[in-house]
Swiss-Prot record:
Gene: Aox2
Function: Oxidase with broad substrate specificity, oxidizing aromatic azaheterocycles, such as phthalazine, as well as aldehydes, such as benzaldehyde and retinal.
Protein residues bound to FAD: 266-273, 347, 356, 360, 369, 413
NCBIfam families per UniProt: mam_aldehyde_ox
Descriptive protein name: Aldehyde oxidase 2
Subcellular location: Cytoplasm
Keywords for the protein's UniProt record, in alphabetical order: 2Fe-2S, Cytoplasm, FAD, Flavoprotein, Iron, Iron-sulfur, Metal-binding, Molybdenum, Oxidoreductase
Quaternary structure, from the entry: Homodimer.
Amino acid sequence: MPCPSQSSDELEFFVNGKKVTEKNVDPEVTLLAFLRKNLRLTGTKYACGTGSCGACTVMVSQHDPVCKKTRHFSVMACLVPLCSLHGAAVTTVEGVGSIKTRLHPVQERLAKSHGTQCGFCSPGMVMSMYALLRNHPQPSEEQLLEALGGNLCRCTGYRPILESGRTFCMESDGCLQKGTGQCCLDQKEGDSSGSKSDICTELFVKDEFQPLDPTQELIFPPELLRMAENPEKQTLTFYGERITWIAPGTLQELLVLKAKYPEAPLISGNTALGPAMKSQGHFYPVLLSPARIPDLRMVTKTSGGLTIGACCSLAQVKDVLAESISELPEEKTQTYRALLKHLRSLAGQQIRNMASLGGHVISRHYYSDLNPILSVGNATLNLLSEEGLRQIPLNGHFLAGLANEDLKPEEILGSVYIPHSQKREFVSAFRQAQCHQNALPDVNAGMRVLFKEGTDIIEELSIAYGGVGPTTVSAHRSCQQLLGRRWNALLLDEACRLLLDEVSLPGSAVGGKVEFRRTLIVSFFFKFYLEVLQELKADKRLLPESTDSQRYPEIADGSRSSLGDFQVTLPQGVQTYQRVNSHQPLQDPVGRPIMHLSGLKHATGEAVFCDDIPRVDKELFMALVTSTRAHARIISIDSSEVLDLPGVVDVITAEDIPGNNGEEDDKLLAVDKVLCVGQVVCAVVAETDVQAKRATKKIKITYEDLKPVLFTIEDAIQHNSFLCPEKKLEQGNMEEAFENVDQIVEGKVHVGGQEHFYMETQRVLVIPKTEDKELDMYVSTQDPAHVQKTVSSALNIPLSRITCHVKRVGGGFGGKVGRPAVFGAIAAVGAVKTGRPIRLVLDREDDMLITGGRHPLFAKYKVGFMNSGRIKALDIECYINGGCTLDDSELVTEFLVLKLENAYKIRNLRLRGRACMTNLPSNTAFRGFGFPQGALVTESCITAVAAKCGLPPEKIREKNMYKTVDKTIYKQAFNPEPLIRCWNECLDKSSFAIRRTRVDEFNKKSYWRKRGIAVVPMKFSVGFAATSYHQAAALVHIYTDGSVLVAHGGNELGQGIHTKMLQVASRELKIPMSYLHTSETCTAAVPNTIATAASVGADVNGRAVQNACQILLKRLEPVIKKNPEGTWRDWIEAAFEQRISLSATGYNRGYKAFMDWEKGEGDPFPYYVYGAACSEVEIDCLTGAHKKMRTDIVMDACCSLNPAIDVGQIEGAFIQGMGLYTTEDVHYSPEGVLYSRSPDKYKIPTVTDVPEQFNVSLLPSSQTPLTIYSSKGLGESGMFLGSSVFFAIADAVAAARRQRDIAEDFTVKSPATPERVRMACADRFTDMIPRDDPKTFKPWSIPIA
């Protein structure tokens, strides 16, 4: 390789209009790292590091001297090598606009449309929309969806983000609700006691937004324009510590370099090479960049086809194909249309902007979406070397890497030739993935057939599959055997048999889902068969007039439904809430849809998160070393090699902890043995994060494996491995009740786990002070007091010496209640030992590997009922997978059992729960805290009863629902009147009865597509079961200028607690919110705080803020009486002069929770949140894909403190719950290694998963006396309502099974992934696939529930 002692060339580019010149660029440095560390532009966030989430989105502008145009495109900064930006202009969120200078309309609209919650994803959302608007100032709705397809948000549910983007779009023709022909604004208001004049449907005022003026954007720097038009042809070389980057200026130079460094890969978009080098250990000392060579970006159109340069991005390829389709006759564009179809859903927009056609082809990934189509479309690869041009077909031989049909080490791919399709030729593409967009396919396919002229006899047939082998697999042998056959039903049967014989998938195949993937092989061909049959029937031009029309049989109406894919459209919806009383003063913000206080800062990137804090003097970085064994004794930890590495300062082990090493069963750092893969064993401290992370790979740990090793709930039950005693509630006489019923049904329910996937990973900054062993800690946590206590215990220092600061948290969902204390303590030990500040920021993979998530559940039920549907007895036994330590598993078990009954009064009821101990990372608190799993069990019982009775599930729900004031199974009294109102309004607003009939009519006519509709009720108990957690304090200071600082014990997680607290203070002090400010949550200002969790943050802290403000106002009363015409500032100045204290501590001694498990009774919860949701879906029975057509939610919020924030909480929780029940599948290896630990392997919902029609109504005229201003906490309750989508899918599956005469007493496990839906819709294709004996192979993954 080149000598690194040589001097590097200068790298020149622009950032936000300012020139940047770097003389010593390390090729391993990414744009994201440079922006954050070197330029201190921290608005661009690190969230995944693999280009899969969009948090690091920026815009890159480059001038193309060939077409004389400047391109603006969004990219993922975490993947962009800094070296690749020579001559480019980068725009970050700071360059778009700021609060300090001028807001850009994108930023303003995102914030004011309530499109930010935690705000961590917001800069990325802004940049994706901004890049779109730079290219299309008035985009279409389809373009908006495409632009945001690569951006993830875990908080909002996307609807308000899309709503903000819609304000820039071309006006549509209206918003007719799908299937009703009515405008969403014409919804019925239901049977509410509030009049229509009291109901509002506007959360923001569109007319107040500043207009978009495209002429005011940053221009492309003239200096870069000159560089592009008159490029320096010499080779640029950048030498790093380990890698050399060479960017030649001409094609010939590149070919010479490739001959000199034949093993050096070409790096273009870095979308494949980057993740491989980061996560898979690949390393290349020399990288060759073809970015400066225009020859490799050329596009040539000829009469026979398209030649596209290998360095063209996939986005450019997409544009070229779309242009050709618009210019050419349809018969010539079959292959182009198939490619374009996959390009719309392949990855996200940013990756399509970065990834090159050549890289996509050459990588030959088994999941490649384009190679199967290029292969069947007879594409040709133009290979270049010093020896000249060599052409090879992109066929099965190339894809298999056969010697004579592959690239030689000294060759590069110059371009790809894609011929036009021809008359009598049909080309189609198919793919099925966990989500519609930004998800790798489970299986994809390209298929092409050419018929002999005037016949349906096959002349050529090509079929290629992705996702069924190590690379794209060509079914060449099957195709050859089908030549000369007619396109009819006999061919279909023979083709399926041949394909299954040739395209074999072993039972242990990587990725699992083997039977599903086998089924897709033939399901896709059936779709292709029908598509071609339809075209043959419809297109008379293909056949001479004398051809017998009976040759092409009519496609049955039911089969016609399998044609085409689900179309994704921008969601529509309406949000309704009750207006504030007309007599309420205008300055009183309570009940109004106030924007999140940090909304504008979120949108401009000026909101400071934990890792955005500037590096402090002498700061070190920490990286964790985790166990690679599930259950083993630690024989030794050898760090000798590590301590000699550059930059490494120390290795922290359990021996370095001066105090307590955590709990007995939950150590901070492992001692003697490990209990799971991912347990933290030790930590490396180094000068930089890169040095620390590299050093962790050199720690040598010797293990001795121990038995037993338990992963599944079934394993734990067999070994009697439990974390705590059984929790049980029972009422009535179970035995007698079961003896006196008409029918009994028994069943099982499985609910998978769920990753928190907060956008901001776990992170902490610890700064030791010079005196008295004091520590300042900046932590991303929901419970700073717990961090403080854990650090105090570990270091043996008083709590008063440790100050924890929480400015804001980039999402928590329960995942930042307990775990941050562990990371904080480990970092604090390192800080004390080294005497230097320590920063610990977990990579996404480590975060997901270590921290655990929602408890997977397995339940058995037995239900006895009358033929009328009245349930007389119900016995449920639940087991949750707690992982290797107790954590919150006992509490989750208690809440699970307490909440299992949901909305139903069942006189004879037995509920039991156990937490299993397994060798997996400990599962922990998660939004809903057991209710989303438990309530799904109960609703599954309801569905089973309905099926047996032959009655609609909603009738069974109504018959068994609480109706009047009653007591729960644990003897707590409550009034279900709001529950009944929510249920009735949901049925009414959703037009359920009408749509139920329409769904049934649709299903009668459609065989391969089925619709389902379901409505579920909810009774969600709010609060902690421990009395000590129902307390809070606040500290309010009034300064002499009249400004007010409010401190309280709640933590801002995105749920808007700071906004709500200032609304409370504004009302109590009778001053505008502009006078009020809150800075952070700090244990020095408000001590002994409780976790911000259980939906009571605003309840308990609101009362404390209210109390403090009332104390202050009481003190000011004499001053105000003396000068009633004075201003607020006058009164404050007078009070100061009179030595009246302008500081007050407020305190709330809240609800006295009580639960006696021995007696099975108590009052554990202060109140309930009631709600109901109705969802309608359509499923594709051949692939398992589904489309969410409409969701209506009615929620009892009582008197909402802030309708905009509360609606956002409901929508966000619903979408997160929908993810739990449909897409978020957790996979572990048979050795206990978590596979799904990055966003490309673990799929949370995206913008394309939002229901097409998404309506939310807050129940009007509802009251509760227990909370601040009669409001309710809504942070968690919407989670379970996502199950309405699950039960709608199950309803659609049931319809399919009925039509196929298959038993309806089936169970779809949660999540209802495409795999599970497809396999539940059993048919001729699922019947024909081969099935393996489970004893003959080792599965890729294991079911932990």
